[in-house]
Amino acid sequence: MDIRATEQTILNWTGETLALGIFEGATELTEELGELNERLGGTLQELITEEEFEAKTGTSAVTRLGKDSPIRKLILVGLGKPEDFKLHSLRNAAANIARSAKKLKIKTLGISLPVFNNAPTLTTGAIVEGVLLALHTDLRFKSEPEDKGAKLETVDLLGLAGQETAINQAQIICDGVILARELVNGPANSVTPITMAQTAETLASDYGLTLTILEQEDCEKLGMGAYLGVAKASDLPPKFIHLTYKPEGTPKRKLAIVGKSLTFDSGGLNIKVSGSGIETMKMDMGGGAATLGAAKAIAQLKPDVEVHFICAATENMISGKAMHPGDILTASNGKTIEVNNTDAEGRLTLADALVFAEQLEVDAIVDLATLTGACIIALGDDISGLWSPNEELATQLKTAAELAGEKFWQMPLEEKYFEGMKSPIADMKNTGPRAGGSITAALFLKQFIKETPWAHLDIAGPVWTDKEGGINNTGATGFPVRTLVNWVLS
């Protein structure tokens, strides 16, 4: 698909289908819309009147035009009230347009949406993201493709001439999001620690990244007892993935992104029972998938920042070699952990990954993980939890998320709650009381960071959706690749 920035407007563009965004309360046609209505022989006003189109957020209306018209079809999308208009409103409007175009089997499309906050570059990026991410469907495991018939070939962004760089950047970021989506969507017999390592190898080869993969023996030498305690039950070997992007010159700063990478989580000997969603546990590597997706985008965007991407990939399985409830593991920083629940395994893998990341002497570390159901109970499916003892880093991430339209809510690191994590026979347990479970999980991870500014993102809710909406289709969302990329670029 060719996405083009053009100086043409709704008054002189010709093509198969024109899509317009209209604000609620602005359905009386004046100025440019009035001129367009005349150009289309009154069809625009007829569509608004006959469909009783009020331009509420998420609504749309479609009509066909006469054979003599310079445009064959017209799509209207509602933008809601002007005072509620945000950058993400553009993404959702573009997604709405893209789905309508797909349903109508449109080949050429002109999109006219308002410029957000006098920022054509941000506007262009948001529209491109909305179109590309809404059109992405993962059909790799279908025996016969369901997408038949004509497909969208050309999209003209009207009134946005000169924004080719913004289009290219948005396409690169979307490629990273789609990589993350497809890794999470892939079943556990397709996406394994081995294939995650192979994906990292492909990224390194294609985009000039440096790759180190630590095998089990390497991890043993580094004392990664927490990570290996989880990994030992699986017949598949663990793969500790370390990708590095380095700019050509001296980096302005050094960052580490650490993604939880459990390619399947059975719960271990504390097995997930029927009704616990065990069949969805292929998504438990959503943090690692987003880490690799961000790596793909950042390697092509080439910021003046050194970035380390770390995925401690493994499965959490059941076998005669599995860790037992009550086992004591020693992490690579020497701290001991009493395992009182083998289904709280992600934090064990992250413990050694965080120690490894800090030893790289980076300026900041962000970990992301589908870590707790408690975070979903607290914040729902659409909002990720954010914990950080460093307010500057937390603010950077929230700003990056706002730009991406990805939702985060900063949660407290209530130190008192760690009392419930203390063990009489080890330095700590891996779970605490039920209350405040997402907070105690973050406090557990905090024990493996000494001084480096650090943030923890619990993405258990937003990494997956069971319903189509906005830029997301059913399945993996690729959350929060765009936030991570924005953070690095900032």
Curated annotation (Swiss-Prot):
Pfam families assigned to the protein according to its UniProt record, in alphabetical order: Peptidase_M17, Peptidase_M17_N
Record's cofactor remark: Binds 2 manganese ions per subunit.
Binding site for Mn(2+) 1: 265, 343, 345
UniProt subcellular location: Cytoplasm
Keywords: Aminopeptidase, Cytoplasm, Hydrolase, Manganese, Metal-binding, Protease
Chemical reaction(s) catalysed: Release of an N-terminal amino acid, Xaa-|-Yaa-, in which Xaa is preferably Leu, but may be other amino acids including Pro although not Arg or Lys, and Yaa may be Pro. Amino acid amides and methyl esters are also readily hydrolyzed, but rates on arylamides are exceedingly low; Release of an N-terminal amino acid, preferentially leucine, but not glutamic or aspartic acids
Cofactor(s) needed: Mn(2+)
E.C. designation(s): 3.4.11.1, 3.4.11.10
GO biological process: proteolysis
GO molecular function, one term: metalloaminopeptidase activity
Active site: 272, 347
GO CC annotations, alphabetized: cytoplasm
Family as reported in the entry's similarity comment: Belongs to the peptidase M17 family.
Function: Presumably involved in the processing and regular turnover of intracellular proteins. Catalyzes the removal of unsubstituted N-terminal amino acids from various peptides.
PANTHER family: CYTOSOL AMINOPEPTIDASE (PTHR11963:SF23), LEUCINE AMINOPEPTIDASE-RELATED (PTHR11963)
Protein name per Swiss-Prot or TrEMBL: Probable cytosol aminopeptidase
